């Protein structure tokens, strides 16, 4: 990918080893609001940045069941499933999406290289193939996203239900359209051959102009998960890839995919303890996915956790006066050491570390001074005009309206207890993708005069 391609036109980009990653086009505020008001097209996960891995063979489904917490019961061609892999401790090794694209072919997203490691050691009649550089990956979301896609495809796509996918064409190019997304509301993905990336992107972009389509960069994309209540790998928590020597040796052979967890930098009051940052499905609200009616790696540990019934995932709404005090600490003169910055980023993601690696931010959540969990994924919610984060906390303190504090600041620096209130979860309170009836949405493919 080059900076001259359509995806990068008008973008402020981050240079990565595999190409340019657009960070912002019109500014993250406008790009975030597009998911609520019109529609966006995003490429944050396009190209080599996203691990795409096919699992094929007679034992493909048996293999997936053996390594995932969900059983894939009733999983049909044309469906999509969320999948989570754990280690023996029940800690999440990765989570992502599986699309069944043929009888014995399952295309996975963000499950490799952990999935590949498990496959190589499975002893089953199953094969794996890396597709990461072979497929483009566009995300569209917002109330007019379906209209945009139909205008580009010249086809009625209303039949694609939530969690489903099927083939279509855009500009004469075969594409797979999936109905899912991280923004909370109506959302789709468009996948196709990497060689057709620019042609497909330009066709969608041009078709979307009458509907107010906005280009979305990585910064706006990273702000969606907290608001929509989707805890995400490499955003809300790191993965225990390098705590197992055999696994670590394997990941070292995948240098383009081990980036997020080989060289970790830890920010926030939780400090350098990686174990305090690793999570289980129950901590982050995914316990409902666990199916104990099949054997899988981590089952015994998760059974113990299910019995303990200790954790809850919540939204934390930050007190604006306490946040303002952290900002004000920068302006109290040279004799006062300020708190860690909270105002120079819309979230706690650090792009420019000056060295290889990836940064994770987590803060302790306190109840009457006692640690009850962690806060991660802090964002400035543009739509709701609040600062919020996700909390993985003791469920005894998880009732909406409960007042807690977040300890802000790295160990050894000035720290402040910021008041937070447990809010609704997810914080996104508009109509959700899985509940939207698209029947009332216009069909541009059937109306050549369609416009805004």
UniProtKB/Swiss-Prot annotation:
Effect upon mutating residue 221 to A: Loss of activity
Gene3D superfamilies: Probable tRNA modification gtpase trme, domain 1
Record annotation: effect of changing residue 95 to A: 60% decrease in activity
S-S bonds: none
Thermal properties: Optimum temperature is below 40 degrees Celsius.
Protein EC: 2.1.5.1
InterPro entries in the record: GCV_T_N (IPR006222), GcvT/YgfZ/DmdA (IPR028896), GcvT/YgfZ_C (IPR029043), TrmE/GcvT_dom1 (IPR027266)
Catalysed reaction, written as an equation: (+)-sesamin + (6S)-5,6,7,8-tetrahydrofolyl-(gamma-L-Glu)(n) = (+)-sesamin monocatechol + (6R)-5,10-methylenetetrahydrofolyl-(gamma-L-Glu)(n); (+)-sesamin monocatechol + (6S)-5,6,7,8-tetrahydrofolyl-(gamma-L-Glu)(n) = (+)-sesamin dicatechol + (6R)-5,10-methylenetetrahydrofolyl-(gamma-L-Glu)(n)
Induction comment from the UniProt entry of this chain: Expression is induced in the presence of sesamin.
pH dependence of this protein's activity: Optimum pH is 7.5-8.5.
Keywords: Transferase
GO molecular function, one term: transferase activity
Role played: Converts sesamin into sesamin mono- and di-catechol. Catalyzes a ring cleavage to transfer the methylene group to tetrahydrofolate (THF). Also active with (+)-episesamin, (-)-asarinin, sesaminol, (+)-sesamolin and piperine.
Assembly and binders: Homotrimer.
Family the UniProt entry places it in: Belongs to the GcvT family.
PANTHER family linked to this entry: AMINOMETHYLTRANSFERASE, AMINOMETHYLTRANSFERASE, MITOCHONDRIAL
Annotated protein name in UniProt: Sesamin methylene transferase
Source organism of this protein record: Sinomonas sp. (strain No.22)
Gene responsible for this protein: sesA
């Amino acid at each position: 990918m080059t900076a001259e391609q359509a995806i990068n036109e008008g973008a402020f980009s981050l240079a990565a080893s595999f190409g340019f990653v657009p960070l912002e086009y019109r500014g993250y505020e406008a790009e975030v609001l597009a998911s609520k008001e019109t529609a966006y097209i995003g490429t944050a996960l396009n190209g080599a940045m996203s691990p795409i891995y096919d699992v094929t063979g007679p034992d493909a489904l048996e293999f997936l069941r053996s390594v995932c917490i969900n059983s894939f019961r009733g999983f049909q061609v044309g469906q999509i499933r969320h999948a989570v892999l754990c280690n023996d401790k029940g800690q999440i090794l990765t989570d992502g999406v599986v699309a069944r694209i043929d009888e014995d072919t399952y295309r996975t997203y963000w499950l490799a290289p952990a999935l590949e490691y498990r496959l190589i050691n499975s002893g089953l009649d199953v094969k794996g193939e890396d597709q990461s550089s072979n497929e483009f990956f566009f995300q569209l979301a917002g109330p007019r996203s379906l209209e945009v896609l139909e205008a580009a495809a010249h086809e009625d796509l209303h039949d694609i239900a939530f969690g489903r996918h099927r083939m279509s064409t855009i500009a004469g190019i075969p594409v797979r359209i999936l109905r899912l997304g991280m923004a909370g509301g109506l959302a789709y993905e468009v996948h196709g051959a990497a060689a057709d990336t620019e042609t497909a992107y330009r066709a969608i972009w041009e078709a979307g102009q009458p509907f107010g389509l906005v280009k979305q960069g990585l910064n706006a994309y990273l702000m969606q998960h907290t608001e929509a209540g989707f805890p995400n790998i490499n955003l809300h928590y790191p993965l225990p890839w390098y705590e197992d020597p055999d696994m670590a040796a394997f990941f070292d052979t995948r240098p383009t995919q081990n980036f997020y967890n080989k060289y970790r930098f830890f920010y926030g009051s939780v400090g350098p303890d990686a174990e305090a940052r690793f999570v289980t499905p129950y901590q982050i609200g995914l316990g409902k996915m666990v199916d104990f009616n099949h054997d899988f790696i981590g089952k015994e540990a998760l059974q113990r956790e299910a019995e303990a019934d200790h954790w809850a995932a919540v939204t934390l709404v930050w007190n604006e006066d306490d946040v303002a005090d952290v900002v004000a600490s920068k302006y109290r003169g040279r004799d006062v050491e300020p708190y860690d910055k909270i105002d120079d980023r819309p979230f706690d993601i650090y792009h420019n570390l000056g060295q290889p690696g990836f940064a994770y931010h987590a803060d302790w959540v306190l109840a009457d001074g006692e640690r009850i969990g962690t806060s991660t994924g802090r964002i400035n919610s543009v739509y709701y005009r609040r600062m919020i984060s996700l909390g993985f906390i003791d469920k005894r303190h998880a009732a909406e309206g409960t007042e807690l504090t977040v300890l802000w600041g790295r160990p050894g620096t000035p720290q402040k207890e910021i008041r937070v209130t447990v809010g609704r979860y997810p914080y996104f309170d508009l109509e959700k993708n899985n509940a939207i009836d698209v029947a009332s949405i216009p069909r541009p493919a059937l109306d050549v005069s369609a416009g805004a």
